[in-house]
């Protein structure tokens, strides 16, 4: 889990002081047991929520799912085995179990760090390179990156922990103790601390600062865009209507089933899918296909249902309309043509940027909470690692124990960060804990055009 041997198994401490009092043992056992239970419960809620709530199945949440898996391993195995070791005062499960525990602990903990790096890089590229990165940001690619993170963690720690004694020809770990053999050298301990904690933290903090600056820049651009619009104007027809250029009229001889010339004019705006934005959980920045320099037309073309030409009586078509369209000049169109009203494309662009900015800020809040929890819980132990490298007896045994357990507490805090910063996680957790989740009793209620909002139709 960390870059050095645990406090009770540190090479700086020959043996864990035995003979803890019964009240002390009871307090440690109850406290650590509750922490383990909270860790397992919280991360199981994350996994179950991802399974039952389709709104949570986004690319960004795939990384949170992987982080929850690592935290679940720590809560299930690492916490309980270390508590047993701490209370007994010696390792009583044999050398094989010791090596397997250390390998599992360090692989899962390093995978947590790798997943935090993935989340940070994912947010950074989503904000700074929205067009090029979003095209490559697929669930399959996210799964590949997560698999590589776990593979790298396994390759870095598991073989060295399990087979180091065979490489050097002997096992130097003292009987009754359990720690990583090759970390008994101070210089190696110092190097692993820098590579496994300080370097990743530096990278993550740098990326978060860049994300923060870019998000603030987006907010200023959005404020300027909204400020340039004229209040109370820019309202247009519904999404089922199209605007044509002034003077663009259909040909009297346009046959049924064909659209007039004004219908074939380039559309000012591309249809926008709110559903896609909802599911992705962060706003994308695909550019609109409209040309902001164009002005909307002064006529509204309303498409009417087609009529079978064979069933129609042979009548002469009116000279100013096609069989399937009706054009009507609008006052707004004349006002826009006369006053140079801003195109509706800017309103749509502002709405998209607003929605995008909200999603980006929500994802940034989740990242900041996870990153802050990681730094606060892992820093004390890793500071002690550096201190013990230069002064073996300067760190008390109790501080080693507290620092090591504090690293484990990070796995308990992470699910709370998801719930505090993400309403979808929070609502799903609440429904699961209250036993009110039943997919068959959920109905779809439209929130926006093209999106659905799931809400319980009745309680169970």
Curated annotation (Swiss-Prot):
Q: What is its main location?
A: membrane
Q: Which residues lie on this side of the membrane: Extracellular?
A: 1-22, 85-95, 165-185, 391-397
Where are glycans found on this sequence? 2, 12
Species for this entry: Pongo abelii (Sumatran orangutan)
Feature: compositional bias, Basic residues: 328-343
Q: Tell me what this protein is called.
A: Muscarinic acetylcholine receptor M1
Q: Superkingdom of this entry's organism? A: Eukaryota
What cellular component terms from Gene Ontology apply here? dendrite; postsynaptic membrane
- Name positions with the PTM Phosphothreonine: 230, 428, 455
Keyword set includes Disulfide bond: yes
């Amino acid at each position: 889990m960390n870059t050095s041997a645990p406090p009770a198994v540190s090479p700086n401490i020959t043996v864990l002081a035995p003979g803890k009092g019964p009240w002390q043992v009871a307090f440690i056992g109850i406290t650590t047991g509750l922490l383990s239970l909270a860790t397992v419960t919280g991360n199981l809620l994350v996994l179950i929520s991802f399974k039952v709530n389709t709104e949570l199945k986004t690319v960004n949440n795939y990384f949170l799912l992987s982080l929850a898996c690592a935290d679940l391993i720590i809560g299930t195995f690492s916490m309980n085995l270390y508590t047993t070791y701490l209370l007994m005062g010696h390792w009583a499960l044999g050398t094989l179990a010791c090596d397997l525990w250390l390998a599992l602990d360090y692989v899962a903990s390093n995978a947590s760090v790798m997943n935090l790096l993935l989340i940070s890089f994912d947010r950074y590229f989503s904000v700074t390179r929205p067009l090029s990165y979003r095209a490559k940001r697929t669930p399959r690619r996210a799964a590949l990156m997560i698999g590589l993170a776990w593979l790298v963690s396994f390759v870095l720690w598991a073989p060295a922990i399990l087979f180091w004694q065979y490489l050097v020809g002997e096992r130097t770990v003292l009987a009754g103790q359990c720690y990583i053999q090759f970390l008994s050298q101070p210089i190696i301990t110092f190097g692993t601390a820098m590579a496994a904690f300080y370097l990743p933290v530096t990278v993550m903090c740098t990326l978060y600062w860049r994300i923060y600056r870019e998000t603030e820049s987006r907010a200023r651009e959005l404020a300027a865009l909204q400020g340039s619009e004229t209040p109370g104007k820019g309202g247009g027809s519904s999404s089922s209507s199209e605007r044509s250029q002034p003077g663009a009229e259909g040909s009297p001889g346009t046959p049924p089933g064909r659209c007039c010339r004004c219908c074939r004019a380039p559309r000012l705006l591309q249809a926008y899918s709110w559903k896609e934005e909802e599911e992705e959980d962060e706003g994308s920045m695909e550019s609109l296909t409209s040309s902001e320099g164009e002005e909307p037309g002064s006529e509204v073309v309303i498409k009417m249902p087609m009529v079978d030409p064979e069933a129609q009586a042979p009548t002469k078509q009116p000279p100013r309309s096609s069989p399937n369209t009706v054009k009507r000049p609008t006052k707004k169109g004349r006002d826009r043509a006369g006053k140079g009203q801003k195109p509706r494309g800017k309103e749509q662009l502002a709405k998209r940027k607003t929605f995008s900015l909200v999603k980006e800020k929500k994802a940034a809040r989740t990242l900041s909470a996870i990153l802050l929890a990681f730094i606060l819980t892992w820093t004390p132990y890793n500071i002690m690692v550096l201190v013990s490298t230069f002064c073996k007896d300067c760190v008390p045994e109790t501080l080693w124990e507290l620092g090591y357990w504090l690293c484990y507490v990070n796995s308990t805090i992470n699910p709370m960060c998801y719930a505090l910063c993400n309403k979808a996680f929070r609502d799903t957790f609440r429904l699961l804990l209250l036993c009110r989740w039943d997919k068959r009793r959920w109905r779809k209620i439209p929130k926006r055009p093209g999106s659905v909002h799931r809400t319980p139709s009745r309680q169970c």
